[in-house]
Amino acid sequence: MVTAVAAKEEPVTSFAKDQLRAIIERIERLEEEKKTISDDIRDVYAEAKGNGYDVKALRTIVRMRKQDANERQEQETILETYMHALGML
């Protein structure tokens, strides 16, 4: 026998379950897309390496291009200062 309280909670519970399932499925789909994109990026780096490019330098350039110009300049200045202090420049 279903009580009145249980009958009222059933649609809410069903909605919550459906919503939770949809969220989980979206996350799983996005994780798969992320893996595919990651594999594609790895392939591009492998291609670049095959063409004679230095992958480490390419990764550094990509990381630097993501930075704000002022932040990048500040990091370069600090690096130069340290290198100069160590007699590397």
UniProtKB/Swiss-Prot annotation:
Molecular function as annotated in GO: DNA binding
Q: Which Pfam families match?
A: GapR_DNA-bd
Q: Which InterPro entries match?
A: GapR-like, GapR-like_DNA-bd
Q: Which family does it belong to?
A: Belongs to the UPF0335 family.
What's the name of the protein? UPF0335 protein Nwi_0989
